Swiss-Prot record:
Residues 152-174, 205-259 form a coiled coil. Residues 439-495 are annotated as: Disordered. It comes from Homo sapiens. Belongs to the SEC3 family. This is Exocyst complex component 1. Transmembrane segments: none annotated. The exocyst complex is composed of EXOC1, EXOC2, EXOC3, EXOC4, EXOC5, EXOC6, EXOC7 and EXOC8. Interacts with EEF1A1. Interacts with SLC6A9; interaction increases the transporter capacity of SLC6A9 probably by promoting its insertion into the cell membrane. (Microbial infection) Interacts with West Nile virus and Dengue virus capsid protein C; this interaction results in EXOC1 degradation through the proteasome degradation pathway. InterPro entries: Sec3-PIP2_bind (IPR028258), Sec3_C (IPR048628), Sec3_CC (IPR019160). GO terms for molecular function: phosphatidylinositol-4,5-bisphosphate binding.
């Protein structure tokens, strides 16, 4: 085992700087091979690392190889299996349990003892030893007396050092000189003892020989100690001197620190003073401008604006911590507050005076516009006030209460001014629409006329926008048609209270121009005022959602102050609402006046609602493109609702007039008045609504009207006593079809086809009904023939029927010679001419259809004769050519 241990040390552990302390020959439990060893090793370098190494003998030779190594610190438990009986088995618990069987119990105990010592020395008893004999562990524990014995192995472990080359050489020389030592160890030991004694004696003699030198050395040491004492005394004196200097330097350093601190404080104090002086010192010129600056001149306004900005900067300066506790700062702030209050009062008072003066100046120009349909220009007023825009912005940020008061006063003054201007403007528009003059209203010598005009004006003003549609729109249209149609219409419908001369195209064109001029004057006026309010009062006017007019109409002078009692500026959304509310207050009379004007236009002619709908829609669309939330857009939108309501009412009135129409029992019906009026309405509407934005409304109205026309044409046709129903339907639907074909109204294509179909159907029905009269007996005879055939009698056997034999056929045919047929056709032509009206010019169309139908019946009769009476030689006493000649001569003779 010693030779194996030496070989393992040399071949495996020495190259790795390790020492082999213990070895045990083992095999795994359950296996018979014993060619592996467990080795306990330590490293020669510090820190010492203790390992358990498994070494296996190579199968191909006698050399060993290192298979696996575990650090001893990873060993948790050493299980010897049995502490009493000898047992070569033991377990080592690393990351898993390794079961071993030693070659002998002695080797196992020696290995476990070595592990115990290494555990005691390097691992501080970390490893648990289970089933290990206490005697084995006690032998390994060092005690006082036997420490040198029991701890020998440990000391050997600690003091073992490998011989260097020189030591190995000396030992080899000594061994060569003492070869007999191998055979005679006692002689060799004795020789070594003698040499040791010789060396000890030499050492003693050397020590005794150096005694004198030692004494000399001691004296030198004593002298050196004395010198050291002297040096220490000098150093002590130097130290005392340095201590004094140190105290003086500390005083100087402290003094310098205080001086530096004082300088720093002075610099900071100067900086604070400069900050306060630079940011809270208002120039005397600014103070003078705020106290007594001229607010009427441009130069004075500029000086006051600069002074107000400087004051605002001084008041809004961000003070540093502690500044607000300084008395001077408090006094300066109070002075600034007094200046701000003083200038705010001066500015508010001056602007109030400007508002009043401008209102008086503007009122003086009203007389110049009283006879013209134009609104006074407020641009000079706005231009003068915009010079104060920056001051208004300053007032808004510094004293919101006075800013709010100015806003209220401006609305009060301007609302009264605009109310006078707008009412006079609308009064002129009404006069121009009605054709009267303002002077005649005021100075008319005829009391009846003056009373009538006054009553009409009062009724319009008293309506407050409440509209009443005309009940005679159909009559008004009929007046514009031809004389014959006008006379028919006047005989059917109530003409209302408006004269026919007021309803011509020129009057409608004049109304259209006046209404357009009214809107064109109002639009720039409102936009200019809204733009001025935004700029002058510094309010944002864009990106606002339009509010309801019902909420805005309740605005009074105190609304704004009630909304912001805190005196703080409005947020952006509230500013947008404020612009809208100010515009509503200033122009509160626009919507009622527009409604009154619309009511007048509707009273003059209900068809004026078409013009108003198109014009108002266009202006609303334009205003919404500029700013959907503007007052103008909202107001015109509300008025547009009224106009649309009037338009719908106009359509409803026309339908109601259709339903109420009454026809004369003594004269023929002809073209119904509402059919002719629909034609003129459609023509007028197409010219008005060309490329208009509200085309959809007209299309809906067309649909309602045409349905009403269709229904009431049938109603009148059913009630007609003088004119046959088919004639009424045929003529009127022909007229409707011609109208729709000419106007090419895309939304009424289906109705156009329906009208054509109704016209065609009733034309055919009328022709068939009328043609049954001239050849009545012949018709009855052949109807009987067809009835027999329908009952199942063969056609060639009909002639054997008593009532329908050849003699009866000849008898009936003889009753209708050519002369009688021509006479009957002539009577038929006269009757048709009596039924049809001249306007539609359908006589020839109907006559030609009758001719075709007569020829068709003739051919039908000829066919029945050929089939039912073959070989009889019976024929009609007139031919198709005779029929053509009869019809042509009759048409030419009339």
């Amino acid at each position: 085992m010693t030779a194996i241990k030496h070989a393992l040390q040399r071949d495996i552990f020495t190259p790795n700087d390790e020492r082999l302390l213990s070895i045990v020959n083992v095999c795994k439990a359950g296996k018979k091979k014993k060619n592996c060893f467990l080795c306990a090793t330590v490293t020669t370098e510090r820190p010492v690392q203790v390992k358990v190494v498994k070494v296996k003998k190579s199968d191909k030779g006698d050399f060993y190889k290192r298979q696996i190594a575990w650090a001893l610190r990873d060993l948790a438990v050493v299980d010897a299996k049995d502490a009493i009986k000898e047992n070569p088995e033991f377990d080592l618990h690393f990351e898993k349990i390794y079961k071993w069987v030693a070659s002998s119990t002695a080797e196992k105990n020696a290995f476990i003892s070595c592990i115990w010592k290494l555990n005691q020395r390097y691992l501080r008893k970390k490893i648990d030893f289970v089933n290990v004999s206490s005697q084995l562990l006690e032998e390994s524990v060092p005690s006082g007396e036997n420490q040198s014995v029991t701890g020998g192995d440990e000391e050997v472990v600690d003091e073992y050092q490998e011989l260097n080359a020189r030591e190995e050489q000396d030992i080899e020389i000594m061994m060569e000189g003492c070869e007999y030592a191998i055979s005679n160890a006692e002689a060799f030991a004795e020789k070594l003892s003698r040499e040791l004694q010789v060396l000890d004696g030499a050492n003693i003699q050397s020590i005794m020989a150096s005694e004198k030198q030692v004494n000399i050395l001691m004296k030198l040491l004593d002298e050196a100690l004395k010198e050291v004492d002297q040096i220490e005394l000098k150093l002590s004196s130097y130290e005392e001197m340095l201590q004094s200097v140190k105290e003086q330097m500390d005083q100087i350093s402290e003094s310098n620190h205080l001086i530096h601190l004082s300088n720093t404080n002075n610099v900071k104090l100067l900086s604070e003073i400069e900050f306060l002086v630079n940011h809270m010192d208002l120039a005397k010129g600014h103070i003078k401008a705020l106290q007594e600056g001229d607010l009427a001149s441009s130069r004075g306004i500029e000086a006051c604006t600069n002074a107000a900005d400087a004051l605002l900067q001084c008041m809004n300066v961000a003070l540093r911590p502690g500044h607000d506790l300084l008395l001077a700062v408090k006094q300066q702030q109070q002075r600034f507050s007094d200046l701000r209050e003083l200038f705010a009062r001066r500015l508010a008072s001056h602007l109030n005076n400007v508002f009043v003066q401008q209102g008086h100046d503007q009122s003086s120009t009203l007389a110049q516009h009283s006879v013209e349909l134009t609104l006074p220009n407020h641009h000079p007023f706005h231009r003068d006030l915009l010079r104060y825009a920056k001051l208004m912005e300053w007032l808004k940020s510094t004293d919101y209460g006075k800013y709010e008061g100015l806003t209220k006063n401006y609305m009060d003054y301007l609302s009264r001014l605009y109310e006078r201007e707008i009412k006079d403007f609308f009064e002129v528009a009404k006069i121009k629409m009605t054709g009267t003059t303002k002077e005649s209203k005021k100075f008319a010598t005829l009391p009846r006329k003056e009373s009538a005009v006054k009553q009409e004006t009062e009724s319009l003003h008293g309506s407050s926008g409440k509209l009443t549609g005309s009940t005679s729109s159909l009559n008004k249209l009929s007046v514009q048609s031809s004389g014959n149609r006008r006379s028919q219409s006047s005989s059917l419908l109530d003409m209302g209270n408006m004269s026919a001369s007021d309803l011509d195209v020129a009057d409608r064109t004049k109304f259209d121009k006046i209404f357009e001029q009214v809107l064109s004057e109002l639009e720039p006026l409102c936009l200019a005022e809204q733009d001025f309010i935004s700029k002058f009062f510094k309010l944002q006017q864009h990106q606002s959602m339009p509010g309801t007019m019902a909420e805005a109409e309740d605005l009074d002078g105190g609304t704004l102050s009630r909304q912001h009692n805190c005196g703080t500026p409005l947020p952006v959304s509230s500013e947008k609402d404020m612009i809208r509310q100010m515009m509503i207050k200033i122009f509160r009379c626009i919507e009622p006046e527009l409604n009154n004007l619309i009511a007048l236009g509707d009273k003059i002619d209900s068809f004026n609602s078409l013009y108003m709908l198109v014009k108002m829609s266009h202006h609303v669309w334009t205003a919404q493109n500029v700013d959907p939330a503007s007052f103008l857009s909202t107001t015109l939108g509300n008025v547009l609702v009224t106009v649309k309501r009037n338009f719908d009412k106009c359509i409803s009135n026309q339908i109601r007039q259709m339903e109420e129409v009454k026809i004369s029992k003594k004269s023929k019906v002809g073209i119904l008045p509402f059919v002719a009026e629909f034609e003129e309405f459609a023509g007028l509407a197409e010219s008005i609504f060309k490329n208009a934005e509200r085309r959809g409304d007209l299309d809906k109205a067309y649909t309602k009207l045409i349905r009403g026309v269709f229904v009431n044409v049938e109603k009148v046709a059913n009630e007609s006593q003088k004119t046959p129903r088919d004639v009424v339907m045929m003529e009127n639907f022909h007229h409707i079809f011609a109208t729709l074909s000419r106007l090419k109204i895309s939304c009424l294509e289906a109705e156009k086809k329906e009208a054509k179909q109704k016209y065609t159907d009733h034309l055919q029905s009328y022709v068939i009904y009328s043609l049954g009269q001239p050849l009545e007996k012949l018709n009855h005879f052949f109807e009987g023939v067809e009835a027999r055939v329908a009952q199942g009698i063969r056609e060639e056997e009909v002639s054997y029927q008593l009532a329908f034999n050849k003699q009866e056929l000849r008898k009936v045919i003889k009753e209708y010679p050519g002369k009688e047929v021509k006479k009957g056709l002539d009577n038929l032509y006269k009757k048709v001419d009596k039924h049809l009206c001249e306007e539609e010019n359908l006589l020839q169309v109907v006559w030609h259809s009758m001719q075709d139908e007569f020829i068709r019946q003739y051919k039908h009769f000829e066919g029945l004769i050929a089939r039912c009476y073959p070989g009889s030689g019976v024929t009609m006493e007139f031919t198709i050519q005779d029929i053509l000649d009869y019809c042509s001569s009759i048409a030419q003779s009339h």
